[in-house]
């Protein structure tokens, strides 16, 4: 069996996953177990939608717990000294300028596990993440998008 790829996480990302796992194990598991118990009390479970819903939620929760445990098992905490400012790396905070519009956007490059575009965290596996990884300030990159090629200039790289 192939060795699983290491997942590099920021301190914030690691804490978020650990907190979610703890919440699922200590709160959500108990809540859904209680819902199943109540649904069984209604009687015949063959046509009991509350029971079915609770069992489906239980399966989802258990699947998410397994997924989080696997991710955390292969996780490595990104140290501050791992974040470079000479080139774009995981953990870098990058200011990009879209060449056509001149609009600037600042993003943080993180692993796919903790990416969240609305928080300005983009995945190193995304088209933009792949394009800027390892590049220096003043570099220009092209990103293929459904609407065509978008060109960005790297304005700033910081921790």
UniProtKB/Swiss-Prot annotation:
PROSITE patterns documented for this protein: GREAB_1 (PS00829)
Keyword S-adenosyl-L-methionine among UniProt keywords: no
UniProt cross-references to Gene3D superfamilies, sorted A to Z: Transcription elongation factor, GreA/GreB, C-terminal domain, Transcription elongation factor, GreA/GreB, N-terminal domain
InterPro entries xrefs: GreA/GreB_C_sf, TF_GreA/GreB_CS, Tscrpt_elong_fac_GreA, Tscrpt_elong_fac_GreA/B, Tscrpt_elong_fac_GreA/B_C, Tscrpt_elong_fac_GreA/B_fam, Tscrpt_elong_fac_GreA/B_N, Tscrpt_elong_fac_GreA/B_N_sf
Top-level lineage group: Bacteria
Coiled coil (UniProt feature): 1-76
Pfam families in UniProt: GreA_GreB, GreA_GreB_N
GO biological process, one term: DNA-templated transcription elongation
Keyword tags: Coiled coil, DNA-binding, Transcription, Transcription regulation
GO molecular function, one term: DNA binding
Function field: Necessary for efficient RNA polymerase transcription elongation past template-encoded arresting sites. The arresting sites in DNA have the property of trapping a certain fraction of elongating RNA polymerases that pass through, resulting in locked ternary complexes. Cleavage of the nascent transcript by cleavage factors such as GreA or GreB allows the resumption of elongation from the new 3'terminus. GreA releases sequences of 2 to 3 nucleotides.
HAMAP family on file: GreA_GreB
Entries under PANTHER family matching the protein: TRANSCRIPTION ELONGATION FACTOR GREA
Protein family per UniProt: Belongs to the GreA/GreB family.
Protein name, per record: Transcription elongation factor GreA
Lineage: Bacteria, Bacillati, Bacillota, Clostridia, Eubacteriales
């Amino acid at each position: 069996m192939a060795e699983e790829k290491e997942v590099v996480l920021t301190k914030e990302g690691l804490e978020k996953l650990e907190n979610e796992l703890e919440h699922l194990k200590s709160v959500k598991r108990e809540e859904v177990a209680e819902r199943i118990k109540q649904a069984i009390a209604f009687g015949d479970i063959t046509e009991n939608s509350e029971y079915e819903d609770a069992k489906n939620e239980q399966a989802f929760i258990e699947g998410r717990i397994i997924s989080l445990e696997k991710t955390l098992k292969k996780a490595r905490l990104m140290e501050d000294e791992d974040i470079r400012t000479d080139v774009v790396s995981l953990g870098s905070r990058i200011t990009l300028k879209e060449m056509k519009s001149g609009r600037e956007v600042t993003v943080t490059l993180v692993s796919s596990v903790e990416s969240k575009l609305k928080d300005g965290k983009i995945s190193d596996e995304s088209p933009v993440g792949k394009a800027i990884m390892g590049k220096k300030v003043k570099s220009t990159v092209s990103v293929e998008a459904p609407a065509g090629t978008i060109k960005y200039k790297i304005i700033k790289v910081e921790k």
